[in-house]
Amino acid sequence: MLDSVPQGDIANVDPALSASSFAVLAPSDLSVELSSDCNGFTGNTTRRSLFDLSATDVDQLFDHNLRCDFNENTGYTVTASGARSNDAAFITEFTFSTGVASSASLTIVDEFDLPRTDINDLFAAYIGDALFDDLALSSGVEALIRQLILELADASWSNLVDPEALYDVTSQKVSYRSRHPDGTPSAELTAAVMFPVLATASNFVTRDRVVILMHATGSTPSNLDNTDAWYILANLFASRGYLVITPDNYGRGGTDNMPETYLMAKRTGLNTLDLIGQVLDDTRYSEVYSGADIAIIGYSQGGHSAVGLHLLLETQGPDHWSVKEVYSGGAPHNLYQTVRGVMQHLDGSCDDGPYCRYVDEETTVPYATDRIFPGFLSYTDTGLQFEDVVTNEDINPAFVTAFLTDDPVTDHFKAMLQLSSFTQLLSAEDNFGASTAKVHLYPSEFDRLVPFDNTLELANLLETALTVDFHERRCNSAGYEAIFNVTEKVGVIHTLCGLSVLNQALADFK
């Protein structure tokens, strides 16, 4: 077994949280059946190709997805049994125990209303101040490209700049019942929930979509901060009549004393699944949203989370929920190759490859050491400690060599990265075949932070099972190219493209 949520030694799993999973390394010719002693058991397996491990007897990653009706204070076993083409038998048993159901529930921590006249001005104020702070450009470079960015705003961000808000909006910071990365109960996770103020709304029509916003790097939506692009975006959608749910990643907001589950798709998805269920079951929101249809929107880290949530809802979500739209841009969908590209750059073996071409030691490497590595090394059994991988904020040269030469010590770390890589799914049809969602994907050839091939590979995979709109031109205009040629600073094009993606998503939700 590679990984599981909950971990196998957990004895107090919240019985109200019915979704769980475990992943194993396996040979490709293994057929598997799942069974369990829990009531209402349903299970399926997501298979991924597995690359660059020292072991030659395993070449696939089996992610077993489960749902059960649990009782309190009860032990359970889930069994994955099967045989290879040579009739050799394999079996994996996943065991855990439930405790007493948590008394925690969806709790409103903070709440206020924002007039629609103020909402109309939020994004324009962000462009004039917070955006350039986020870009952190030198004064000389900012002077060169400020006009280019303002021209881009005029051409590509019109819905954000002039949103024509229909309603005042209530902003809520909430906490909810969920789980820590090891599967133990948690009541500390937080989120922002936004919706129109119905008391001042005339002729309001209940919407048939709930909008799930998956935040990008550095955002904490529950802070309800009007300089945070994701808080602003949540207001804009809510001002058009939608119920908007915007979770904080574990490690932000109410759990900010812990490492973030950064790009850990399964754990982020399970937390979000728990949140959505509690919001939609709460009658306080029933006048705003009535139905079972879901739209998921994310960019960068959030774009990765959006695809991960879509996959989780198709494999483990309630049967009556239906994902209708997914918007994902600038995301490391091939997380393994993205990290490998960093290693190749540091090793000097890049040779202009698509995943290492623009790696920058000032910006890209800290994304690995400060954001990606801490969660994977803290919450999963890779056999590695953080100090084995990082020393004085740099990736250890010995670890880089071990990673690129397929040293056995790196096997589980590599496999965990691949468990969060969507481009390695063997069959989109097996996992998304029943979905009616339209998936919008946005890359930029000028993005120095997240390589273009991440999105290209995912589009090629998903189009076999889903309706995919690959917006290749959205962030590849002459304006983006001009900015790309003026500055080599990593993250500038990435950030600007994100705003174009969000502008398009907002345009689709009248």
Question: Can you say where each PLM-predicted feature lies in the sequence?
Answer:
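N-terminal non-catalytic regions of secreted/periplasmic and cell-surface proteins
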Residues: 1-37, 77-81, 90-100
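Short, surface-exposed "cap/lid" segments of acyl-processing enzymes
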Residues: 181-190, 194-240
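Short beta-strand/loop motif that positions the catalytic acidic residue
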Residues: 435, 440-443, 447
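Accessory cap/linker subdomain of secreted extracellular hydrolases
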Residues: 127, 131, 139, 328-432
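Conserved alpha/beta-hydrolase "acid-adjacent" motif
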Residues: 448-454
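C-terminal catalytic histidine-bearing segment of alpha/beta-hydrolase fold enzymes
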Residues: 456-457, 464-510
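Catalytic-loop region of hydrolases
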Residues: 2-4, 25, 44, 48-50, ...
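Alpha/beta-hydrolase active-site loop
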Residues: 262-285
